[in-house]
């Protein structure tokens, strides 16, 4: 049994070798000749999986180690009788922590308290729900927009997108990309919506590039609209609008979900799905794969305020480390993908063990996802 895996899927070679012969290949462009005798294909979001790639090939199963699936033609796979699995929620924690790293950087730079801001969350799935929970743990007001969930009657006080634009100081997008249909998200943030945002608002896109109309956004910024922008995703990736990058406050190369934990979850989820598909079901404990974190433990004295939280968050991950490299190479062919391929290891907050002498600080840090314990000072 031959299994092709994306060369940038951590732990893929070790895990899938339990099931068959493993060959690691680039995801973009994928070497088509390798598909001629392969039984399974494991990809990331950079690989377009459709009829033109797989027609006439012996592939029986496709797995994508990503939460999003807009790069996969699921309908064609089903029609062709090819098994499929994604990894929903695998990188949700990573994306939430990316948003926090960005907001805390902007708050320090511009001198505001997050408690004074209302956050509008567009898309309340795996990422949106976790973001809502962590913001509300800090006492920050959230507004939710998710028409599909509202129409299904899911629990939540859902508002319209226009209402969020009018009332939110921060608008952050966490939706799939739907190019048509009743819940179309292509250019969900169009010129009209962008112009309707509150003066000084913060716009964040960490889902799919085309959810925000990049041309319209650049037009608004060029005309002097007071708006802070955080973009991790871009229309036309791996190409991007260099002029737009110059205008945004934080720009990164589609790495919001790129924690080691998030990548490992993606790999293990599709590994478990494929092992079940072939009748040799196996399960993997994530902590058996992950290395020891760079920072083992630290001690925190006193209560948790915003500056202290910012220092803790940026100790684990400071978004500026990914902004600067993109600006240096933007517009150079191949460099966007190279930044992603050679991405510096990044961990999640749970990797940091925090010893607190303040019980409320320990409790709050645990709610936020840190590994915190209370030890009273002696």
Swiss-Prot record:
Gene3D superfamilies assigned to the protein according to its UniProt record, in alphabetical order: 3.30.1370.170, NAD(P)-binding Rossmann-like Domain
Enzyme class of the recorded protein, top EC level: oxidoreductase
GO terms for cellular component: cytosol
Chief localisation class: cytoplasm
GO molecular function: 4-phosphoerythronate dehydrogenase activity; NAD binding; protein dimerization activity
Claim: RNA-binding is one of the keywords in the record: no
Similarity comment: Belongs to the D-isomer specific 2-hydroxyacid dehydrogenase family. PdxB subfamily.
Role description: Catalyzes the oxidation of erythronate-4-phosphate to 3-hydroxy-2-oxo-4-phosphonooxybutanoate.
Name of the protein in question: Erythronate-4-phosphate dehydrogenase
Provenance organism: Escherichia coli O81 (strain ED1a)
């Amino acid at each position: 049994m031959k299994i092709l895996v994306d060369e940038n899927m951590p732990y893929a070679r070790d895990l899938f070798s339990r099931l068959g012969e493993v060959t690691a290949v680039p995801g973009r462009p994928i070497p088509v000749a390798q598909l001629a005798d392969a039984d399974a294909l494991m990809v990331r979001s950079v690989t377009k999986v459709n009829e033109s790639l797989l027609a006439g090939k012996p592939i029986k199963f496709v797995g994508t180690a990503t939460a999003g699936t807009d790069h996969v033609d699921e309908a064609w796979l089903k029609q062709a009788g090819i098994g499929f699995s994604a990894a929903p929620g695998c990188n949700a924690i990573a994306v939430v922590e990316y948003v926090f790293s960005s907001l805390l950087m902007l708050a320090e730079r511009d001198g505001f308290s997050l408690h004074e801001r209302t956050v509008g969350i567009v898309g309340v799935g795996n990422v949106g729900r976790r973001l809502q929970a962590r913001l509300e743990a800090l006492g920050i007001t959230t507004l939710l927009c998710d028409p599909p969930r509202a129409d299904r009657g899911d629990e939540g006080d859902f508002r319209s997108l226009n209402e969020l634009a009018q009332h939110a100081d921060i608008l952050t997008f966490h939706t799939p990309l739907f190019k048509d249909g009743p819940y179309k998200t292509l250019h969900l943030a169009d010129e009209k919506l962008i112009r309707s945002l509150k003066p000084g608002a913060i716009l964040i896109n960490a889902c799919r590039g085309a959810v925000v109309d990049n041309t319209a956004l650049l037009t608004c910024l060029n005309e002097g609209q007071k708006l802070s922008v955080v973009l991790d995703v871009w229309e036309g990736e791996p190409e991007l609008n260099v002029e737009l990058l110059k205008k945004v406050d934080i720009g990164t190369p589609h790495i919001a979900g790129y924690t080691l934990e998030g990548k490992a979850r993606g790999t293990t989820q599709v590994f478990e799905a494929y092992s079940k598909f072939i009748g040799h079901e196996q399960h993997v404990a994530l902590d058996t794969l992950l290395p020891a974190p760079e920072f083992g433990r630290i001690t925190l004295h006193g209560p948790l305020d915003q500056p202290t939280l910012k220092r803790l968050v940026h100790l684990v991950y400071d978004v500026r480390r990914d902004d600067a490299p993109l600006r240096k190479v933007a517009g150079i062919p191949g460099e966007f993908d190279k930044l992603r391929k050679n991405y510096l290891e990044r961990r999640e907050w749970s990797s940091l063990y925090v010893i607190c002498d303040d019980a409320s600080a320990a409790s709050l840090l645990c709610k936020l996802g840190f590994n915190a314990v209370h030890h009273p000072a002696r």
